Amino acid sequence: MTSRDSASSEITPAVLLRAYACGIFPMAESADDPTLFWVEPELRGVIPLGGFRVASRLARTVRSDGFRVTVNTAFKATIAGCAAPQAGREDTWINKRIRDLYSGLFELGHCHSVEAWQGDDLVGGLYGVSLGRAFFGESMFHTARDASKVALVHLVARLIHGGFELLDTQYVTEHLKNFGAVEIPRRRYTALLDKALAGEPGDFLKLSPGEAIPGARALEIIASRQ
């Protein structure tokens, strides 16, 4: 289900948080389209944290620590990377309005990024929204092989360690299926979301602020949930 906002409506970071609490999120038709529309899928993509899968080759890459992984150190560069065209993804739904709104959520502590570096070059990463014990993954990018996958592994370890219960991917792609993503009906999703929003919120920075932990430790945390 989609619903377009009027040109005069004002979507603020506070409005955005209320929308996420209701299971709704905004998108744009393209990076050049200034308008947004609200989305509430009939089938929602989630990755069960206890069922997150890491292929053997990727696990070796994670353990090698070939990428320097950081958290919340290059948010604007990460969202810009997600908005940039890539092979197989010539256009994106991330327009300037989206970038500004989520930068506002970042300033409020409700949006986070995980970045993967080679030297001084940002070569991959992801960002998403944290609310209660739910994390809503928004987008990821990479310019080096496996960079965004390594960032995702570190994200999941952080969510598990921080007491999160729900990793919402919004939709399921063939790529995300490799990590255990599944589609669930809206009613089931709403029940999971309500549970994740009740009680004490998750602590995204409990694992470590700034620099991420070694890859081997991230894999240990993930294995402890399975």
Swiss-Prot record:
Swiss-Prot/TrEMBL keywords: Acyltransferase, Cytoplasm, Transferase
One Pfam family it belongs to: Leu_Phe_trans
Coiled-coil regions listed in the entry: none
First-listed, main subcellular location of the protein, grouped into a coarse class: cytoplasm
Signal sequence coordinates: none
Lineage top rank: taxon: Bacteria
GO molecular function: leucyl-tRNA--protein transferase activity
GO BP term, pick one: protein catabolic process
InterPro entries: Acyl_CoA_acyltransferase, Leu/Phe-tRNA_Trfase, Leu/Phe-tRNA_Trfase_C, Leu/Phe-tRNA_Trfase_N
Catalysis: reaction(s): N-terminal L-lysyl-[protein] + L-leucyl-tRNA(Leu) = N-terminal L-leucyl-L-lysyl-[protein] + tRNA(Leu) + H(+); N-terminal L-arginyl-[protein] + L-leucyl-tRNA(Leu) = N-terminal L-leucyl-L-arginyl-[protein] + tRNA(Leu) + H(+); L-phenylalanyl-tRNA(Phe) + an N-terminal L-alpha-aminoacyl-[protein] = an N-terminal L-phenylalanyl-L-alpha-aminoacyl-[protein] + tRNA(Phe)
Listed EC numbers: 2.3.2.6
Gene Ontology cellular component annotations, sorted alphabetically: cytoplasm
Subcellular location: Cytoplasm
Family, similarity comment: Belongs to the L/F-transferase family.
Function: Functions in the N-end rule pathway of protein degradation where it conjugates Leu, Phe and, less efficiently, Met from aminoacyl-tRNAs to the N-termini of proteins containing an N-terminal arginine or lysine.
Name the UniProt record assigns to this protein: Leucyl/phenylalanyl-tRNA--protein transferase
Organism encoding this protein: Bradyrhizobium diazoefficiens (strain JCM 10833 / BCRC 13528 / IAM 13628 / NBRC 14792 / USDA 110)
